[in-house]
C-alpha cells in the first residue's frame, strides 16, 4: 500500500463544523471518506465493477446504510450479541441516500456500483441521515467512478415559527416540520418531509432555504476532489441505432396509437406486448443467427423508445394522456368503509385501477412498538404497514416478506397521518394500520394514505381532520422551460416521466411530502406548480372521501378492547405492582384485563368487556387511593384483638377500630360487639402521617359526631364508663397479655398518688420505659 496521505476539508454548517476526510481509511475502495459533524462520525465507501453487467437495461446501484450499536456505546440485545438485519431506520436512510445520487450517473452506465455507509459514532445530537447523503456523494466525487456533480443535504425544521437548518435532535420534537432536502449546486434533487399542516408556500420556502444552506457542503466536496480526487474512468454510453425507429413506426401505422391509448392497464399492456412481438418478428426475419440477439435488442430498444416518445409528445403537445385524461385530471374514485365485519376499522379506496384496502386494529398501550437502535430508546403507538403482493400488478412471483420499497411506502403513509392523530393522553390506544394493495396502476402509496384516513375514522379514532394523498408527475421537453405537471400519475407515466412528487395532507396543509426525479434537477417554478396542482387534487379527493365519511364514528368498534385511564400517585406504583409483581398479576387473573403502568402514575386498563374494566378499576383504586379523614366505609371485620377490631375498608387496606370507638358505652370484650366476618360501618377519624395507618370509629356513626370531634375527644381523655373517650390506645406489639397469677402484686412503698405527680416506676420495668411505648399521657 502506498504511503498514507490524509486530506480533509471543514465547513461550518448551522453553526457547527462539518469535516470530510479522505485517505485515512478504506484505501482499497474506489473512494472513501469519513464525515464528522459534532461527535457523529460516518464512513462512506464506494466501489464499482470493472465491467458492465450483461443482459440488463437498468443501472445496478446498491446503497447500504448500516447502524453499528457500538456507535452509541451499546451492545446488541439479540442472542448472538451482534447486529442483525437492517433496522427500519437503516432501510429508510439507504433509500434516502439512493434517490438523489441515482440520476447523476451517466445514462447507459450498467456497471455494478455499491455505496456502503456505516455509522461509527453518534452523539444523539446530530442526525446521521443527511450526513449519509453527504458522505456517499463525497466518496463518489473523489472516486474514479463516473458521477456528474456533488450532492449536498440538510435537515430543515420549523421551530417556534422560525425555519432552522440542521436543528439538534432534541429540538425536532417540537418542530412543525422534518424535511430532508438534497441537491446539486444548481437544482434540488430530492425532498422528503413530514409536517404539521404546513402550507405549500411554507414548504417551498423551507426547500429553498435548505438548498441555500447546502451550498457550502457542495463546495467543500469540490475542494476535496481537487486535493485528492482520482481521474474519472472514461465512459462512453452505448450507441443505440435509432435508424429503425422511422421504419418501425411506419410499419405499425395506426396499430401503435390504438394499442397505446387505452385507459385499461391490462388491455393496453396486452396490446402493446402483442404489437412488440409482431415488430420483432417483422424486423428480425432473415437475420443471421449470430446477429439475431443484437438485432432483437436493437428492435426492442427502438420500440420502447417510440412508446416513450409518443406518450411524452402527446402530453406536451396536446395535453392528453394515454388514458384520455387532461394533465390535471384525477381518475375515477370509489370510497367505502366498514367493509370487513370483525375488524376494528376498514377502508377501501379505489382510484382508477389502483385499489388499496386498509385495516385498522386498536390495541393496548402495552402493544406499542419498542424501538432500540442508535437513537434514544422510544416507543411507537401508531404503525402503518404496506403490503404489495404480486397479484396487484398481475405478476406471478414468490412473496419473501416486505421489501425496501414496501417499508418506504409504509413509512410515508405513516408520516402522513401522524400529525392528525389524537393526543395519547386522550386516546391511549396503540394503532396498527395495514394497507393491502389489491391492484396497482400507480400511486399506491398515496392510496394507502387515503385508505388509512378512512380506516381510522371507521375505527372511531378521533383524528383532527381527514387526510388524502396524490402523486404528481412531470414531463419535460427538449426546449428550455417546456414542461407539463401531471396530476395523479399512473404506472406508465411514472415509468416514462421525469418526476414522482407525492403530497399528502388535509385541507389546511401538507402532512407528508416525497419527491424523486430522474433528471439532473427541477426548478422552483416546476415545484411551485406541482404544489398547487397537488393541493387542488388533494381537496378534490377529500371531497369524495367526505361524501362517505368525514369524521370519526361516535364510538370504537364493539370488537375493539376498552381502555380506562387512571391516575395514581407515583409513590403507589409499588403497592399496585406488589412484591415480584404478585399484586398486579392477581388483578390481571381476576379481571382478564391487561394493565400497563407508566412512570408518571398513569395506569391503562385494557379489557375486552366493561365488567372486567370496572372490576379492575375498583381494585386498582382501592390499592392506590388514600382514605381521607371523615370518609365513611362499610367493610368486613378481618381481625380481632383485645384492644380493638381491624376492618377492611379498601382493597388491601385495613384500619383499626379501637375498643373505645366500638360503641357508645364502655366495651369490656371486643367480641361482645363484633366478630370476624361481620360488616361494620365506620368513619376514618385519623390517618397517621408517614405510615398511612387508619384509625376508625364506629362510635362516630352511632353518635353522629364528626371525625374531628371523635379525635379531639379521644385525645383529651374522659370518663372510663358511660362512653367517655380518652383510652390509652393499643400498645405496640399487641396486648400485654395476662398478668402473672392473675394479680399485679403489691404496690411498692405505699399507695400511688391520686392527684398529680408521677405514678412512679412500675416494678421490673426500668422507670419510664414501657416496652417501646413512651408515656400514657
From Swiss-Prot:
The record's subcellular location field reads: Cytoplasm
The Basic and acidic residues compositionally biased stretches are 728-761, 768-777
Report the CDD domains cross-referenced here: KH-I_PNPase, RNase_PH_PNPase_1, RNase_PH_PNPase_2, S1_PNPase
Region Disordered, as annotated, extends over 703-777
Q: What is its EC number?
A: 2.7.7.8
**Cellular-component GO terms for this entry:** cytosol
Q: Which family does it belong to?
A: Belongs to the polyribonucleotide nucleotidyltransferase family.
Name-wise, this protein is Polyribonucleotide nucleotidyltransferase
Say which species the protein is native to.
Herpetosiphon aurantiacus (strain ATCC 23779 / DSM 785 / 114-95)
Amino acid at each position: 500500500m502506498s504511503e498514507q496521505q490524509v486530506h480533509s476539508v471543514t465547513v461550518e454548517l448551522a453553526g457547527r463544523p462539518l469535516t470530510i476526510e479522505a485517505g485515512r481509511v478504506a484505501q482499497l475502495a474506489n473512494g472513501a471518506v469519513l464525515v464528522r459533524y459534532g461527535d457523529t462520525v460516518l464512513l462512506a465507501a464506494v466501489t464499482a465493477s470493472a465491467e458492465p453487467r450483461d443482459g440488463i437495461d437498468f443501472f445496478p446501484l446498491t446503497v447500504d446504510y448500516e447502524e453499528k450499536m457500538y456507535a452509541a456505546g451499546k451492545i446488541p440485545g439479540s442472542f448472538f450479541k451482534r447486529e442483525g438485519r437492517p433496522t427500519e431506520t437503516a432501510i429508510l436512510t439507504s433509500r434516502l441516500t439512493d434517490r438523489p445520487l441515482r440520476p447523476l450517473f451517466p445514462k447507459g452506465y450498467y456497471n455494478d456500483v455499491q455505496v456502503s455507509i456505516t455509522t461509527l459514532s453518534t452523539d444523539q445530537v446530530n442526525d446521521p441521515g443527511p450526513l449519509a447523503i453527504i458522505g456517499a456523494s463525497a466518496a463518489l466525487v473523489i472516486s474514479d467512478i463516473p458521477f456528474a456533480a456533488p450532492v449536498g443535504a440538510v435537515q430543515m425544521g420549523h421551530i417556534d415559527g422560525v425555519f432552522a437548518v440542521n436543528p439538534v435532535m432534541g429540538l425536532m420534537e417540537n418542530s412543525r416540520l422534518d424535511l430532508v432536502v438534497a441537491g446539486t449546486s444548481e437544482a434540488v434533487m430530492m425532498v422528503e418531509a413530514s409536517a404539521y399542516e404546513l402550507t405549500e408556500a411554507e414548504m417551498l420556502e423551507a426547500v429553498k432555504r435548505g438548498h441555500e444552506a447546502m451550498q457550502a457542503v457542495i463546495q467543500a466536496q469540490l475542494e476535496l476532489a481537487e486535493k485528492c480526487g482520482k481521474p474519472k474512468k472514461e465512459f462512453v454510453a452505448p450507441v443505440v441505432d435509432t435508424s429503425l425507429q422511422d421504419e418501425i413506426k411506419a410499419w405499425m401505422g395506426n396499430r401503435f396509437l390504438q394499442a397505446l391509448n387505452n385507459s385499461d392497464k391490462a388491455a393496453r399492456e396486452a396490446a402493446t406486448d402483442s404489437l412488440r412481438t409482431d415488430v420483432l418478428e417483422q424486423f428480425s426475419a432473415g437475420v443471421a443467427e449470430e446477429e439475431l440477439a443484437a438485432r432483437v435488442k436493437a428492435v426492442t430498444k427502438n420500440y420502447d423508445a417510440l412508446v416513450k416518445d409518443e406518450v411524452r409528445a402527446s402530453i406536451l403537445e396536446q395535453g392528453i394522456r394515454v388514458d384520455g385524461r387532461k394533465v390535471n385530471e384525477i381518475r375515477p374514485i370509489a370510497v367505502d368503509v366498514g367493509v370487513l365485519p370483525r375488524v376494528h376499522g376498514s377502508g377501501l379506496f379505489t382510484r382508477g385501477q389502483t385499489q388499496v384496502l386498509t385495516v385498522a386494529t386498536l390495541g393496548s398501550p402495552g402493544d406499542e412498538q419498542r424501538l432500540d437502535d442508535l437513537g434514544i430508546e422510544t416507543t411507537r403507538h401508531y404503525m402503518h404497514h404496506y403490503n404489495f403482493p404480486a397479484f396487484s400488478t398481475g405478476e406471478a412471483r414468490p412473496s419473501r416478506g416486505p421489501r425496501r420499497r414496501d417499508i418506504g411506502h409504509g413509512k410515508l403513509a405513516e408520516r402522513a397521518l401522524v400529525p392528525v392523530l389524537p393526543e395519547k393522553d386522550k386516546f391511549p390506544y396503540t394503532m396498527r394500520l395495514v394497507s393491502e394493495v389489491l391492484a396497482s396502476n400507480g400511486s399506491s402509496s398515496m392510496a394507502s394514505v387515503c385508505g388509512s384516513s378512512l380506516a381510522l375514522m371507521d375505527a372511531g379514532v378521533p383524528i383532527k381532520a381527514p387526510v388524502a394523498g396524490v402523486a404528481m408527475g412531470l414531463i419535460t421537453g427538449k426546449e428550455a422551460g417546456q414542461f407539463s405537471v401531471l396530476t395523479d400519475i399512473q404506472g406508465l407515466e411514472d415509468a416514462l416521466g421525469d418526476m414522482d412528487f407525492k403530497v399528502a395532507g388535509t385541507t389546511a396543509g401538507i402532512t407528508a411530502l416525497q419527491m424523486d426525479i430522474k433528471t439532473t434537477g427541477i426548478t422552483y417554478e416546476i415545484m411551485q406548480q406541482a404544489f398547487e396542482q397537488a393541493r387542488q387534487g388533494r381537496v378534490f379527493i377529500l371531497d369524495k372521501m367526505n361524501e362517505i365519511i368525514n369524521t370519526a364514528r361516535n364510538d370504537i368498534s364493539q370488537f375493539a378492547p376498552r381502555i380506562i385511564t387512571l391516575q395514581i400517585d407515583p409513590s403507589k406504583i409499588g403497592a399496585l405492582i406488589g412484591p415480584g409483581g404478585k399484586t398486579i398479576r392477581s388483578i390481571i387473573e381476576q379481571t382478564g384485563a391487561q394493565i400497563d403502568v407508566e412512570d408518571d402514575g398513569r395506569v391503562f386498563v385494557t379489557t375486552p368487556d366493561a365488567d372486567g374494566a370496572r372490576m379492575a378499576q375498583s381494585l386498582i383504586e382501592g390499592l392506590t387511593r388514600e382514605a381521607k379523614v371523615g370518609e365513611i366505609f362499610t367493610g368486613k371485620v378481618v381481625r380481632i384483638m383485645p384492644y380493638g377490631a381491624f376492618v377492611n375498608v379498601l382493597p388491601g387496606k385495613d384500619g383499626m377500630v379501637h375498643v373505645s370507638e366500638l360503641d357508645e358505652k364502655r366495651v369490656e370484650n371486643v367480641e361482645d360487639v363484633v366478630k370476624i366476618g361481620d360488616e361494620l360501618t365506620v368513619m376514618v377519624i385519623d390517618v397517621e402521617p408517614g405510615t398511612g395507618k387508619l384509625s376508625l370509629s364506629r362510635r362516630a356513626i352511632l353518635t353522629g359526631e364528626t371525625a374531628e370531634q371523635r379525635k379531639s375527644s379521644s385525645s383529651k381523655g374522659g370518663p372510663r364508663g358511660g362512653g367517655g373517650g380518652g383510652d390509652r390506645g393499643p400498645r405496640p406489639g399487641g396486648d400485654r397479655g395476662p398478668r402473672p397469677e392473675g394479680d399485679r402484686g403489691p404496690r411498692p412503698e405505699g399507695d400511688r398518688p391520686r392527684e398529680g405527680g408521677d405514678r412512679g416506676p412500675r416494678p421490673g420495668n426500668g422507670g419510664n420505659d414501657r416496652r417501646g411505648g413512651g408515656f400514657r399521657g
